Amino acid sequence: MGLTPDFLSFCLEFSWTFLLVVIFFFIIFKVTKSHSVNKSKKYKLPPGPKPWPIVGNLPEMLANRPATIWIHKLMKEMNTEIACIRLANTIVIPVTCPTIACEFLKKHDASFASRPKIMSTDIASDGFLTTVLVPYGEQWKKMKRVLVNNLLSPQKHQWLLGKRNEEADNLMFYIYNKCCKDVNDGPGLVNIRIAAQHYGGNVFRKLIFNTRYFGKVMEDGGPGFEEVEHINATFTILKYVYAFSISDFIPFLRRLDLDGHRSKIMKAMGIMKKYHDPIIHDRIKQWNDGLKTVEEDLLDVLIKLKDASNKPLLTLKEIKAQITELAIEMVDNPSNAFEWALAEMLNQPELLKRATEELDNVVGKERLVQESDIPKLQFVKACAREALRLHPMEYFNVPHLCMNDTMVGDYLFPKGTQVLLSRVALGRNPKFWTDPLKFNPERHLKEGIDVVLTEPDLRFISFTTGRRSCPGVTLGTTMTIMLFARMLHGFSWSAPPNVSSIDLTQSSDDLFMAKPLCVVAKPRLAAELYSTNEFK
């Protein structure tokens, strides 16, 4: 008699359970001594589920994947806006209230300015050489200065304007071709997720490497195989970089890779290196051989940075690692925000009408939107801000690690505590937002006040705040608003035939739409505005 799929599944589940039991008993013998060291200290901590000895709430976490959803469900059941979850020897503090979040990131920012050192961030940062994922210390300070002063300064932002414009123009060209040519999906049907993610990937490649394509140039302006593989690897890293891997809390299990996170991140990082490294090596050789003498992109800037002794400021490993982290940072929020916003606006056509009317009034229909128009596009910016509030990319912000015993309110948090600010719960907190689940850009419009995508009071999280705030606010805001503005100004959007309304169902294990948004686009400007210099 053959082995049935059900029997094999049972064996796999039994093996996993048995292995966990063995691991837990092993931990009891190995860590009881170290665990007892902390018993002399009594900390008053927020409420939370009763932990098991030694392993804490790890069994519940492993039984309720994904952990992000389990934590939110747990806090809702407990009716609390701050909780304490013990995962082995790690204390995790999720927060869903903006007022409490500000206590951590504004009042006590200096104490919570570090990051945990875990398997996924070790791999993604190539040994903690970058900025966002790196613990507080000299390496972080060094790389933060590089970003702020050399890559993302106002001067560099203006220097790179032409490259950003090229990719905004190419986006128009690509969507126009989808409108006007018979394609596999039918004339005019556009996969918004692919288009928006491709735009983010294009901007990254153009700013860093001065190219749109790693492989063959696609005549329709769309992504080729290499670009699709690259962007997919980027989102894989984003998915697993802080995914509550069991080895984050029991480090000696890293090599066993019980949940598969390590292999997935390693594979994705291999893809990133496959495309990045040859370009970086060749560019360094060009500079060393005197074949290149003028800086043309941010890779050139990184290579030519000098220290006080006029020696290269960055090592080859630091350059590679920081470029990969920039790729991760540049592609996520703009694409996800626009996909959700367009879906919401198609179900509320009056919002779509108001946005296009604003664009027509500010820009007209004889030219394309430019970055210089952004200050006047208050409603478009409000739509983007509302999308970031209601539909964040991740459940939690990057963890903040407590660097010393710290009193916050009535609680004393021990050194090593990890604080997680819930992006989804902060933005949907009914105490701070009226009708929080409704997409309502109007809530962000106030007479005489410019709409911005930042939120220093942490009523939602876009670029966060404090020492670990994102240094790329200007670039991130520009990319997001230009994506919204170009797509809404350049095309009329409608649901596919026989679809009465857009399905706004959220994915079961992340915050993407359950199905990629595929809608019909029609050009609303003169045909010559959609062509680019490259393809004329």
Swiss-Prot record:
Keywords: Endoplasmic reticulum, Glycoprotein, Heme, Iron, Membrane, Metal-binding, Microsome, Monooxygenase, Oxidoreductase, Signal-anchor, Transmembrane, Transmembrane helix. Its main location: membrane. One of its GO terms (molecular function) is monooxygenase activity. It comes from the Eukaryota. Residues 30-536 are lumenal. Heme binds at C470. Pathway: Secondary metabolite biosynthesis. The chain crosses the membrane at residues 9-29. Its cofactor is heme. Belongs to the cytochrome P450 family. This is Isoleucine N-monooxygenase 2. The gene is CYP79D4.
